[in-house]
């Protein structure tokens, strides 16, 4: 049938602010497939509490994949990309200022270590982190653009996720603060905007995913849980509201 939709703002206590928008309408044909996305409470009950967790959906098959990884046709490409990172000398530069390359290298090292468990990849990630942390990130650099923010955030997030049990408390805290800077900057901007925006290319191409991943890493952190869990719920509900129409892509 024909559905009508309008919106207005409300604060965190549910107190409405401002007037209703003009009504919108759309039609749902009878032949439209029915799909009900899981409630956030169900998603939350299944969220992991251990690290690494960014690719927790692979956990049931990861051991089998590791046994067979060397026979996979893409194994040489996997290790070749990681070797590029191993061969790069970051000791004379600020890695945070070259996020294009840094993103590729942290992704390649993450994937290679996750599948091979070869410590040369995790050791390289750790050395890279030490160099990254040696250069404090200014707001001017971190928020130069929304892609710049999430490029930097995901580099730190991958290392945090993969090396969590190896990092010192100070190293963990430094990465957590960086991720929280990004979450606190963008979450207020997204609320009330993205759910009423037809399509924001940057948001759906990368930014939403990275921000969601940062929230997933911190949702059960004793320092940030109360602040981060509502953020995670917001992005989950926003994604599931849009996902069926876009094929979950």
Q: Model-flagged regions — what are they?
A:
Residues 1, 15-16, 65, 80, ...:
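Alpha-helical interaction segments
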Residues 75-79, 83, 87-249:
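Aromatic-lined, polymer-binding surfaces characteristic
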Residues 21, 57-58, 168-169:
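Helix N-cap and loop-to-helix transition residues
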């Amino acid at each position: 049938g024909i559905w009508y939709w309008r919106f207005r703002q409300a604060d965190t206590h549910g107190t409405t602010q401002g007037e209703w928008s003009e009504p919108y309408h759309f039609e749902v044909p009878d032949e439209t497939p029915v799909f009900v996305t899981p409630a956030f409470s169900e998603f939350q009950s299944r969220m992991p509490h251990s690290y690494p967790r960014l690719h927790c959906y692979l956990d049931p098959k990861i051991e089998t994949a590791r046994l067979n990884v060397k026979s996979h046709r893409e194994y040489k490409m996997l290790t070749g990309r990681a070797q590029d990172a191993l061969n790069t000398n970051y000791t004379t530069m600020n890695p945070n200022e070259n996020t294009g390359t840094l993103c590729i290298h942290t992704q390649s090292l993450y994937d290679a270590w996750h599948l091979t468990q070869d410590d040369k990849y995790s050791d390289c990630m750790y050395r890279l982190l030490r160099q990254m942390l040696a250069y404090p990130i200014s707001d001017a650099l971190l928020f130069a653009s929304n892609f710049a923010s999430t490029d930097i955030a995901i580099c730190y997030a991958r290392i945090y996720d993969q090396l969590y049990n190896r990092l010192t408390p100070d190293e963990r805290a430094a990465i957590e603060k960086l991720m929280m800077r990004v979450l606190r900057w963008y979450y207020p901007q997204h609320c009330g905007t993205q759910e009423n925006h037809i399509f924001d290319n940057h948001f759906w191409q990368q930014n939403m995913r990275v921000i969601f991943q940062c929230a997933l890493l911190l949702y059960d952190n004793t320092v940030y849980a109360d602040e981060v869990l509502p953020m995670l719920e917001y992005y989950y509900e926003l994604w599931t509201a849009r996902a069926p129409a876009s094929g979950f892509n």
